[in-house]
């Protein structure tokens, strides 16, 4: 009888615990907000927490990762190491969802942050110079932005053109960020060329070498208004399938692995050069806010219809392989495909991260 009673008690406890996990809903979920909607105290809290993470020691061995000097660099190195299996493919959206979650968890558990990771709505203020994410004009030294443009650097004829065939006026920056909270933000790994990204490409030689330099930006209003305008957002949310949704985010030249710019890449190149580095873009603090908005859009698409027209629940909709640009013969991804996160956290199956109010997640966007 004692054994039966114990088993019954254990079963009841498991049932209660399971019920607790399942209780997350829109009312009790933590809220991720747009940067411009945060209060000054909330903005300062996030900025301080990010700098706190920068002050903490790395968990990677320095002899193998000489460019990794702190916890922020742990996130950068992990992204570099996995670039070819987390971009332009099926794991892209779920992997970055978990990546942001791990970042938020580190801010909270290691730096005492009590907020969430904010996001950058590309369309809320498309004039990047006055967007709250980048605007330092109110008070350059104490700005509650993520810092603004870089110093002007005249473009060179040898600079790679990310979108050949389109004639955009050059930006006003290109050099080191001059003011705001992140003017002294260190950048340590890379830079890498987009030509180093192709299916089955190895991790670049000396990928983790220590190459200290400044955070560089070249805010490009013309590009953000071209690639990330309200019509693009409408198309994303109206996408009839996850394949179409992905293609709007990251376009590929038909019949090839060669990349073309979509909404995802548009956000990166509109802020670069640091954010435009496909391997090492998390070295720009705007990275998490950019990908936070992509996660918002994916979640909104997931919740906007019962199925994709292909008999697939949108919460389970997946398309593509586990390799960069989905080349022929690459392994098809499934909900059981395991994603790695290195020193940041334990591996996750794609199916474990498909719902932001399921599993270990409990958040929503507003």
Curated annotation (Swiss-Prot):
<feature type="glycosylation site" description="N-linked (GlcNAc...) asparagine">
    <location>
        <position position="319"/>
    </location>
</feature>
<feature type="binding site">
    <location>
        <position position="87"/>
    </location>
    <ligand>
        <name>Cu cation A</name>
    </ligand>
</feature>
<keyword id="KW-0479">Metal-binding</keyword>
<protein>
    <recommendedName>
        <fullName>N-acetyl-6-hydroxytryptophan oxidase ivoB</fullName>
        <ecNumber>1.14.-.-</ecNumber>
    </recommendedName>
</protein>
<feature type="glycosylation site" description="N-linked (GlcNAc...) asparagine">
    <location>
        <position position="121"/>
    </location>
</feature>
<keyword id="KW-0732">Signal</keyword>
<keyword id="KW-0560">Oxidoreductase</keyword>
<dbReference type="GO" id="GO:0004497">
    <property type="term" value="F:monooxygenase activity"/>
</dbReference>
<keyword id="KW-0186">Copper</keyword>
<feature type="binding site">
    <location>
        <position position="96"/>
    </location>
    <ligand>
        <name>Cu cation A</name>
    </ligand>
</feature>
<comment type="pathway">
    <text>Pigment biosynthesis.</text>
</comment>
<feature type="signal peptide">
    <location>
        <begin position="1"/>
        <end position="18"/>
    </location>
</feature>
<dbReference type="InterPro" id="IPR002227">
    <property type="entry name" value="Tyrosinase_Cu-bd"/>
</dbReference>
<comment type="function">
    <text>Nonribosomal peptide synthetase; part of the pathway that mediates the biosynthesis of the gray-brown conidiophore pigment. The first step of the pathway is performed by the nonribosomal peptide synthetase ivoA that catalyzes ATP-dependent unidirectional stereoinversion of L-tryptophan to D-tryptophan with complete conversion. While the stereoinversion is catalyzed by the epimerization (E) domain of ivoA, the terminal condensation (C) domain stereoselectively hydrolyzes D-tryptophanyl-S-phosphopantetheine thioester and thus represents a non-canonical C domain function.</text>
</comment>
<dbReference type="Pfam" id="PF00264">
    <property type="entry name" value="Tyrosinase"/>
</dbReference>
<dbReference type="GO" id="GO:0046872">
    <property type="term" value="F:metal ion binding"/>
</dbReference>
<feature type="glycosylation site" description="N-linked (GlcNAc...) asparagine">
    <location>
        <position position="114"/>
    </location>
</feature>
<dbReference type="InterPro" id="IPR008922">
    <property type="entry name" value="Di-copper_centre_dom_sf"/>
</dbReference>
<keyword id="KW-0503">Monooxygenase</keyword>
<feature type="glycosylation site" description="N-linked (GlcNAc...) asparagine">
    <location>
        <position position="81"/>
    </location>
</feature>
<comment type="similarity">
    <text>Belongs to the tyrosinase family.</text>
</comment>
<feature type="glycosylation site" description="N-linked (GlcNAc...) asparagine">
    <location>
        <position position="28"/>
    </location>
</feature>
<feature type="binding site">
    <location>
        <position position="291"/>
    </location>
    <ligand>
        <name>Cu cation B</name>
    </ligand>
</feature>
<dbReference type="InterPro" id="IPR050316">
    <property type="entry name" value="Tyrosinase/Hemocyanin"/>
</dbReference>
<keyword id="KW-0325">Glycoprotein</keyword>
């Amino acid at each position: 009888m004692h054994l039966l009673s114990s088993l019954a008690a254990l079963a009841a406890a498991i049932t209660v615990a399971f019920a607790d996990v399942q209780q997350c809903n829109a009312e009790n979920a933590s809220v991720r907000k747009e940067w411009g909607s945060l209060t000054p105290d909330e903005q300062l809290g996030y900025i301080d927490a990010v700098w706190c993470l920068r002050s903490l020691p790395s968990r990677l061995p320095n002899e193998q990762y000489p460019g990794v000097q702190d916890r922020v660099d742990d996130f950068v190195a992990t992204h570099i190491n996995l670039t070819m299996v987390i971009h332009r493919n099926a794991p892209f959206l779920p992997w970055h969802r978990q990546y942001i979650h791990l970042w938020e968890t580190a801010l909270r558990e290691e730096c005492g942050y009590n907020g969430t990771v904010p996001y950058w709505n590309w369309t809320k203020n498309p004039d990047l110079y006055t967007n709250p994410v980048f605007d330092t004009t109110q008070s350059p030294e104490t700005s509650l932005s993520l810092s603004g443009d870089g110093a002007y650097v005249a473009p060179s004829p040898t600079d790679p053109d990310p979108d050949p065939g389109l004639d955009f006026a050059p930006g006003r920056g290109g050099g080191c960020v001059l003011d705001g909270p992140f003017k002294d933000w260190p950048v340590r790994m890379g830079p890498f060329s987009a030509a180093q990204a192709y299916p089955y490409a190895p991790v670049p030689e000396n990928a983790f070498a220590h190459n200290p330099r400044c955070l560089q930006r070249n805010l490009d209003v013309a590009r953000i208004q071209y690639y990330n305008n309200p019509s693009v957002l409408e198309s994303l949310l109206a996408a009839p399938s996850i394949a179409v949704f992905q293609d709007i985010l990251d376009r590929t030249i038909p019949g090839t692995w060669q990349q073309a710019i979509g909404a995802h890449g548009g956000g990166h190149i509109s802020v670069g050069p640091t954010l435009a580095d496909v391997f090492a873009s998390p070295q720009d603090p705007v990275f998490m806010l950019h990908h936070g908005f992509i996660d918002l859009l994916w979640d909104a698409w997931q919740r906007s219809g019962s199925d994709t027209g292909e008999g697939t629940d949108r919460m389970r909709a997946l398309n593509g392989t586990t390799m960069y640009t989905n080349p022929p013969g690459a392994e098809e991804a499934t909900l059981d495909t395991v994603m790695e996160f290195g020193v940041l956290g334990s591996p996750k199956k794609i199916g474990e991260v498909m719902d932001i109010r399921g599993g270990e997640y409990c958040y929503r966007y507003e």
